[in-house]
């Protein structure tokens, strides 16, 4: 019985490390993605944070964001998953508007969301796109936009 507990703990630690590794691989690409989508120059980049822990002024709750990038008129919130499933899309779409409660000083920015994973099934790309999300997966520049040409992300 003790060895099962130990094995479960090791699996949990491995899953955590895989998630962190995926975040580490995705994070450097996110500012470029926003600059590309928002036609925003390097000089206009206001804020980039990886694993940013912020307190909600209303609820006092602390939340960690995988990547937050502010450039021009936009605030992009990225969530990275080691394995992306449909429920991740659903939960992320619901949580995006809450970003404003954690970053009230960017109230005038248009908030857009990006979900990333190292491998994203085509059906999940379309599902994310249908929900107004940027979908990021591995490509020539490690992470590239997988949405249809001309896709405009929903502004939350």
Task: Enumerate the predicted regions with their spans.
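Residue-level detector of flexible, active-site-proximal loop/helix-junction positions
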Residues: 52-54, 84, 120, 142
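Conserved catalytic cores of phosphodiester-cleaving nucleases, focusing on short active-site segments
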Residues: 30, 65-88, 92, 97
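Domain-level recognition of nuclease-like catalytic cores that cleave nucleotide substrates
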Residues: 111-156
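A short coil-to-beta-strand element that immediately follows conserved catalytic motifs
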Residues: 39-48, 107-111
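Charged, alpha-helix-enriched surfaces in structured cytosolic catalytic cores
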Residues: 21, 25, 62, 87, ...
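Arginine/glycine-rich "motif VI" loop of SF2 helicases in the C-terminal RecA-like domain
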Residues: 98-108
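Active-site metal-binding core of divalent-cation-utilizing nuclease and nuclease-like domains
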Residues: 42-72
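Amphipathic, low-proline, heptad-repeat alpha-helices and/or compositionally biased low-complexity charged/polar-rich
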Residues: 1-37
């Amino acid at each position: 019985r003790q060895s099962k507990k130990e094995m479960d703990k090791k699996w949990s630690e491995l899953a955590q490390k895989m998630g962190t590794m995926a975040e580490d691989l995705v994070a450097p690409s996110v500012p470029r993605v926003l600059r590309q989508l928002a036609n925003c120059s390097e000089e206009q980049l206001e804020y980039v944070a990886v694993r940013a822990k912020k307190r909600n002024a209303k609820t006092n709750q602390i939340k960690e964001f995988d990547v937050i990038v502010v450039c021009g008129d936009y605030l992009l919130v990225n969530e990275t998953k080691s394995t992306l499933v449909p429920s991740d899309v659903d939960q992320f779409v619901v949580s995006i508007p809450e970003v404003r409660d954690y970053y009230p000083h960017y109230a005038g920015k248009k908030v857009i969301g990006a979900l990333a994973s190292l491998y994203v099934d085509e059906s999940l790309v379309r599902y994310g796109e249908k929900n107004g999300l940027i979908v990021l997966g591995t490509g020539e520049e490690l992470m590239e936009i997988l949405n249809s040409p001309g896709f405009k992300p929903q502004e939350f």
